[in-house]
Design a protein with these regions (language model features):
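Conserved pre-motif I regulatory segment
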Residues: 38-87
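Extracellular Ig-like/FN3 beta-sandwich strand-entry sites
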Residues: 3-5
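Extracellular recognition modules
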Residues: 7-11
């Protein structure tokens, strides 16, 4: 059981006999709620790729059905425009879940714009090559990767529909969002590897995520945020 109260004592290290004591009562203390347990993985029948209800989209996948995690989150990601956080183990198919959100966007809005944020340049290169082949050659989406040079990146942002970038590059480009309409025109913001928020580059990642939410509130336009993370 908790004691009825603690005493907080503050003593100055500069002045003699300068101290105070404050009783802190626990009588009406409100404890924080316990962390919610992980979402239970339901025993669902695996969804076939025909659930995409689009012949072109179905050609993007070489497998007949989605895995259990993809099946469970499919409705939340592909059939709604709500913000979504998906925490799942490595190699559980989170990239395909990101693709659900991208396909949803361009099914609803052919002129939409998506930003896909990754933690490092190597992963950005890999995803750019993968999605350029997958989306550009199959369904005609313009996939670009930011370079870090502001002038070139503004041009890439203007013509790109799927923009692959790192947090630091997007931070530089989005700081002057009031003067950059193409930043305001982002409809979907996907953040991969969100568990790195507590790491060395976490502050920049936190800033750009908060900024996108702030932009959305200021221009009164929904910017959907989909966050992907390894299980913590």
């Amino acid at each position: 059981p908790l004691p009825p109260q603690y005493f907080l004592r503050v003593v100055s290290d500069r002045w003699l006999a300068s101290e105070t004591q404050l009783p802190v009562s626990f009588r009406h203390l409100i404890l924080p709620e316990k962390n919610l347990p992980p979402t239970e993985l339901l025993d669902l029948q695996p969804l076939p790729i025909t659930a995409l209800r689009n012949a072109k989209y179905e050609t993007l996948y070489k497998f007949p059905q989605f895995n259990p995690i993809q099946t469970q989150v499919f409705n939340a990601v592909f059939n709604s425009d709500e913000n979504v956080f998906v925490g799942a183990p490595t190699s559980s198919g989170k990239t395909t879940i990101a693709e659900f959100a991208i396909l949803r966007l361009f099914q609803q809005n052919a002129d939409g714009r998506c930003v896909y944020l990754v933690p490092n340049e190597a992963l950005a290169d890999m995803m750019f090559v993968q999605w350029h082949k997958k989306f550009s050659e199959t369904i005609g989406l313009r996939v670009v990767k930011l370079t870090g040079e502001t002038g070139a990146d503004l041009k890439l942002l203007a013509r790109g529909q799927v923009i692959v970038t790192t947090a630091d590059k997007w931070d530089i480009l989005s700081r002057r969002w009031k003067q950059r309409k193409n930043v305001q025109n982002v409809n979907l913001f996907i953040v991969d590897e969100l568990h790195l928020l507590g790491g060395e580059d976490g502050p920049v990642l936190e800033v750009v995520c908060s900024r996108m939410r702030y932009i959305s509130s200021q221009i009164e336009k929904q910017i959907r945020i989909v966050a992907l993370s390894s299980s913590l």
